Amino acid sequence: MPDRTEKHSTMPDSPVDVKTQSRLTPPAMPPPPTTQGAPRTSSFTPTTLTNGTSHSPTALNGAPSPPNGFSNGPSSSSSSSLANQQLPPACGARQLSKLKRFLTTLQQFGNDISPEIGERVRTLVLGLVNSTLTIEEFHSKLQEATNFPLRPFVIPFLKANLPLLQRELLHCARLAKQNPAQYLAQHEQLLLDASTTSPVDSSELLLDVNENGKRRTPDRTKENGFDREPLHSEHPSKRPCTISPGQRYSPNNGLSYQPNGLPHPTPPPPQHYRLDDMAIAHHYRDSYRHPSHRDLRDRNRPMGLHGTRQEEMIDHRLTDREWAEEWKHLDHLLNCIMDMVEKTRRSLTVLRRCQEADREELNYWIRRYSDAEDLKKGGSSSSSHSRQQSPVNPDPVALDAHREFLHRPASGYVPEEIWKKAEEAVNEVKRQAMTELQKAVSEAERKAHDMITTERAKMERTVAEAKRQAAEDALAVINQQEDSSESCWNCGRKASETCSGCNTARYCGSFCQHKDWEKHHHICGQTLQAPQQGDTPAVSSSVTPSSGAGSPMDTPPAATPRSTTPGTPSTIETTPR
């Protein structure tokens, strides 16, 4: 009894209170350990929760620090020196157990979201224990992976207790003659084994982010829920989860305390509300749930400090309600999808039936039209046949009406009419394309013909000019040869022989004389025609024409002599041979 009377005069979670709890609390859920010195506050900034409350900075191993609104003195030191404080062996074991439960809960929470996120969380946890990640990096990467921010007490808790786990890992690795990374890779189940530790509810570690659509773990409410209510009714000083941040401000409860013993500051007016704060909107669940959160809180109010711990235990059931809300939203979404599928199926059925009805009506009127044509051609037999198929007697007036109906465009959905219009449109496009193609081809042919005509005229002019120039050049050469007595009359080179018939033409050899004989024989020997009738001219053997061309005397003189007539006989006689 002296312990109980002393508890009313001490601070919350004082060493005396913690010693009392250590005797009553089972090993699965240990209370916060005792502190060995003055309260130490961390440098962690208080963070406003989603329901509008704030957590004040936590101290080492659950010792209370003055809240932000009630502190009269400054804080002592930063959280960097928390890991250097010596702890008793029993307290260290409890802190290691809490830290392992915390890491196991994080890993299982990631697995509940998805296997990929669970694997990423496991990698982050191993990196944190292996000292490859700092606590701040672990906090940011975990929030990025799960999209859930951790509660403000987590970083000071890790800074205070992670060195204990790392020292234990280093000690075990030295005993196994391995480095810590190898030992942790081989004995990972000792750190993240859910069967050896009792994991806490993930809602105690993570802030409420209902609007981002993340799910909560639905399968751990009984571990921290009403299954332990008889135990807590017998021992109200026991705490169901020593690292739970589930305390939330309530207007009916006044000042509440964090699970590690730190009182909350006076909160601002709430801006966000939990689902339990709006219990009136969820009457559909009250019939099969336990007594409401507000009733149990009013019942436990006379208990003082421990009533807040009972409220903390009740807060664990919030995940069940949120899980029900998620299922409700999912069920509503599935119902909407089913309604859309059903409406789409009905619409398709109606369209198919309309199409079939239109096709049957079209076939019916086609048969009526064919029967009417047969009636005109075949007579009474066709008339009786059409009367059997048609409910209306095929009189001439009705036939005219049916014919007009057939030629009138149908107002409903007629596949044949649509197909006919599509074919006509395609044919029209083809005709236009062919017309354009023919125009393009004819234009190209016309341009090519004009180009060919122009080029041909240019070519003809060029050829005519070349011929004229060649003729002028030939005449100039001939005239130059006739004027010169020293050049060959055929090729223009230096002449060495003279024609024996006229002693005028000069040649460079017998070849040129034979070549020029066709032109030269018309004028050769005209001046010596009278004297040459009596005697045969003596022709040099070197310049005798070929037999095929005939002798100069055998060839009759031309009627028209060349423009340059040889000189007089006296001149010819005097010309040296």
From Swiss-Prot:
Residues 1-10, 211-237 have a biased composition (Basic and acidic residues). Its main location: nucleus. InterPro entries: CBFA2T1 (IPR013290), CBFA2T1/2/3 (IPR013289), NHR2 (IPR014896), TAFH/NHR1_dom_sf (IPR037249), TAFH_NHR1 (IPR003894), Znf_MYND (IPR002893). Residues 310-356 are annotated as: Important for oligomerization. Residues 310-356 are annotated as: Nervy homology region 2 (NHR2). GO terms for biological process: DNA-templated transcription; fat cell differentiation; negative regulation of DNA-templated transcription; negative regulation of fat cell differentiation; negative regulation of neuron projection development; regulation of DNA-templated transcription. Residues 1-87, 203-271, 374-396, 529-577 are annotated as: Disordered. The modification Phosphoserine is found at residues 14, 390. Residues 416-465 are annotated as: Nervy homology region 3 (NHR3). A zinc finger (MYND-type) spans 488-524. One of its GO terms (molecular function) is zinc ion binding. Residues 68-87, 380-390, 536-553, 560-577 have a biased composition (Low complexity). Keywords: DNA-binding, Metal-binding, Nucleus, Phosphoprotein, Repressor, Transcription, Transcription regulation, Zinc, Zinc-finger. Transcriptional corepressor which facilitates transcriptional repression via its association with DNA-binding transcription factors and recruitment of other corepressors and histone-modifying enzymes. Can repress the expression of MMP7 in a ZBTB33-dependent manner. Can repress transactivation mediated by TCF12. Acts as a negative regulator of adipogenesis. PANTHER family: MTG8 ETO EIGHT TWENTY ONE PROTEIN (PTHR10379), PROTEIN CBFA2T1 (PTHR10379:SF5). Belongs to the CBFA2T family. This is Protein CBFA2T1. It comes from Mus musculus (Mouse).
